[in-house]
């Protein structure tokens, strides 16, 4: 009996193990089928989404085309005046799904082909080249960074900054706000720097465009860019349009080739935009040029350009102010006479004065010094002002580096060779030209008078 019971228990255990293994196998099959089902459902959803997109696209393709127009003004709550090119202007109805408050002048709209009903507001079309002209970051230039232009700063504040910040003053006086200003003068006198400072202090959108960017080879492209430029300025008002090198498109209208005709069309569109936009739209135009003599008189008349500001070369006091501004953060030695440096640069522009400070720092860097000396400034002035390269060294440097002991004879004849080096009785440096020279020391009785030798072998007492 006991043997039979043991056999039965063993048989039951084996049967249980068999069914458990079968159950595990079936669970694996069910899990596999479930994963396949989820994958197929995901694929079905993806295909359904594509089908919906294709149906919507097909529906749009089957619809009739719409006319594109530009809103002139709203007539009432249900009708607006729209300009459609080239048909003309039409008074159209507004679809019930469109809010009349969103329909603003100069916005692009879509009109139904059959009923001319306004059924969609379109985004304004702006050329990517035009949108890149807008400077996203406010310029960091300030009036304190401009030296010697106090009169010009005061005049541009009255024309640009005051109308933007305090338009009520003009309304109280009953006068129209100025539209634009022209900055003219030699290159490097601070025209662009002052325009950037105005944009910084007025907190306006700064749109910078060069006149050469508006010169296109295809007919009508330059005029279209001018139109889109002012459209973008209206969208981001208050804004300042700074047009540098305006003489490239604003020259006098004269007969010429086809390229000149395209430039003239671009200028005519610019004149149209200057006459078209209202001054109260907080759009100000600043133009800069160094050739005011070739600009067309139609561009310079009041109403388009209300003020012309001259930027002359800085005088001595202005050069001193510019030197102080640009040397403010430089590590200078004591006793540097900036006024003397300013006196050494007659007729220099502001950019050249700044270049002197940079070049002086480069001389100090070349000698591995952490400070700038008076001699560095003197050599920088000689280099920036384009003097003789053989004289681009101060007298003190020459005294330290290139001198000979007094020659006690009145006349000495010698032949310079590449290997000759003379210092205290020998050559100091290798000369660049090897000619036969005659050194005449007419002051041979003055024992301690040095004879200076330059790099080309010339000797001076």
From Swiss-Prot:
Ribonucleoprotein as UniProt keyword: no
Gene3D superfamilies registered for this protein in UniProt: 1.10.8.60, Nucleic acid-binding proteins (2.40.50.140), P-loop containing nucleotide triphosphate hydrolases (3.40.50.300)
PROSITE patterns noted in UniProt: AAA
Protein name per the record: 26S proteasome regulatory subunit 8
Source species of the chain: Xenopus laevis
CDD domains: RecA-like_PAN_like (cd19502)
One Gene Ontology MF term: ATP hydrolysis activity
Subcellular location(s) of the protein: Cytoplasm; Nucleus
Binding residue positions for ATP: 185-192
Family (UniProt): Belongs to the AAA ATPase family.
Pfam families associated with the record: AAA, AAA_lid_3, Prot_ATP_ID_OB_C
Main location group: cytoplasm
A GO CC annotation given for this chain: nucleus
GO annotation terms (biological process): proteasome-mediated ubiquitin-dependent protein catabolic process
PANTHER family assigned to the protein according to its UniProt record, in alphabetical order: 26S PROTEASOME REGULATORY SUBUNIT
Cell cycle recorded as keyword: no
Role, per record: The 26S proteasome is involved in the ATP-dependent degradation of ubiquitinated proteins. The regulatory (or ATPase) complex confers ATP dependency and substrate specificity to the 26S complex.
Keywords: ATP-binding, Cytoplasm, Nucleotide-binding, Nucleus, Proteasome
